[in-house]
Amino acid sequence: MAKANSKEDHLIVMTKESELHEGRARIKVVGCGGGGGNAVNRMISKALKVQFIAVNTDKQALERCQADVKVQIGNKVTRGLGAGGDWTRGRDAADESRTELGAVVQDSDMVFITAGMGGGTGTGSASIVAEMAKEAGALTIGVFTRPFGFEGRIRNDTAEEGIKALRGQVDALIVIPNDRLAQVASSKTTLEEAFRMADDVLRQGVQGISDLVTQPGVINLDFADVKAIMENAGEALMGIGHGAGDSRAEDAAKQAVSSPLLETSIDGAKGILFNITAGKDITLQEVQKAAEIVRAAADPGANIIFGVVRDDTMAGEIKITVIATGFGGKTQQEARQETARRTIDRPELGLEELGDINIPAFLRNRM
């Protein structure tokens, strides 16, 4: 189903009905520009239970995206030919299409905005999409990548302009430096694979949060739990860990809290949200061990909330995503100046020392 009144109209294409269910939080993911559209396609391939929206100035790029809703912005500014890497044109295109952008983020409880910073459309439009989502009353979370260093100073400076514009427009801002991906890439990783990794880390950031609300699990969270950590949180950090074998829980948790994606430690964070994804073979002791490690790495007074998501394809494995928030309005650069990464090898905590981790009563009673 397509809607178009004239050649000058903004194009909104509905490709399929949203698969949202009654009684669930209304979650939307908006991919801005080429990188955001690529991330949306990766999320769709992983069957995330959210509504997907693609925003672009480039009509051809939109046609390749598999999003539920596609919004072509800035027809007068770009004539459907893209922003040419100029973030101010991307911003002007989004400004021209405020009405359309406001319409697609209405009736949302949570809106994720994702893009690869440094280009024209994604960098320029993201802050305006965020502004529209906040005005609609949604919990607004930005998940973005910063360009690789080899992409040059201009692209990196452009990214900083986009990130600066986003501060104050989102509840939580997660920025992952692509250069950090080099620390987990092998010497044989191709350039194409590196950019795919950058797209996929955007997917992991969104999925790590949204799955806690939308996916069935041993320990489920609701929207209010996520909102308690993410609302007005400012800049946030994300770490991802994976483990297999006998020490999988410990390995995954340690990787997550000392992840190469983290530009600093999670010391000083006032809120921690973490997702444990595993098959049905996960044990109570493994959940407790993972929680202990995250708790030991966090601020003593941090509000820590977690959920356990079941994924039957992960038998024998555990993946942990940690989101740390509440750094008192500090930027990541300021946080790096105040804290150094610390060793995670801590004494094991007993259950009584986990009192400030939000463990559901039914599970606490079983421990």
Regions found by a protein language model. Name each.
Residues 2-367:
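Tubulin/FtsZ superfamily GTPase core signature
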